[in-house]
Each structure stands twice: as structure tokens, then as C-alpha cells.
From Swiss-Prot:
Pfam families in alphabetical order: Ribosomal_L12, Ribosomal_L12_N
Quaternary structure, from the entry: Homodimer. Part of the ribosomal stalk of the 50S ribosomal subunit. Forms a multimeric L10(L12)X complex, where L10 forms an elongated spine to which 2 to 4 L12 dimers bind in a sequential fashion. Binds GTP-bound translation factors.
Name of the protein in its database record: Large ribosomal subunit protein bL12
Keywords in alphabetical order: Ribonucleoprotein, Ribosomal protein
Top-level taxonomic group: Bacteria
Any one Gene Ontology BP term: translation
Organism of origin: Phytoplasma australiense
GO cellular component: cytosolic large ribosomal subunit
Amino acid sequence: MAKLTKELFISALKEMSLLEIKELLDGLKEEFGIDPNALAVASAGPSNAPEAEEKTEFTVVMKNFGKNRLPVIKVIREITGLGLLDADKFIKVPDQKVKENVSKALAEDIKAKLEQAGAVIELQ
């Protein structure tokens, strides 16, 4: 007797009518003592996983400074307090973290200022 693979079983199920599938489920219940309804309820039951919480702290990441770096340097100096040369070096590094662990409102404000200056920004 050839081994029944999952693919063959699924293919056979596709060709069955609803009545035949119900009879198959009844046969499984009788043969193995399995109640398909209990399995469905158990699998759809409440999860012990914690619900996703809304983020309260964000990191502002500058992907790149865009076409013109001078306006971005000015905004970076304003936000970080860096000097001119340090701000220039800062913006040349891709995926640079501008500010870490800041509130959503502050992160969005920083993002808006930098995007207005031409930078590409991502909030993480």
C-alpha cells in the first residue's frame, strides 16, 4: 500500500462533497476520539501573548541628507547642539540616529523639521 501524502490527502478532500467530508470527520471522531469542534475552539481561544502596546518612545533616524546638506546641517545643529564641523560629519553617515527614546510628538516634530530641510527620515 502506497503512503498517503499530505498533498494526495488534500487533493482527495478537494474532490469530496460536503456530505462526504462530514462523514470523514465523523469517522475520525469515532476512530480516534477526536472532536474537530473542540480543536477549532481550542485553537481560536484566548491567547496568552501580550497585546501589542502602542509605542511611546521613538528613535529618529536620518537615512540620508537629501540633495542640499546645508539646511540639514542647520537643523541638526539646532536639535543636537553640535558644532558646524561635527554636524557636517554627522549628516554624512547613513542611518544616523538623530535622537533616541523621545516622545512621539517630539519625534514627529524633529522629523518634520528635517524633512522640510530635505533629509530622508524614519521613525523607529
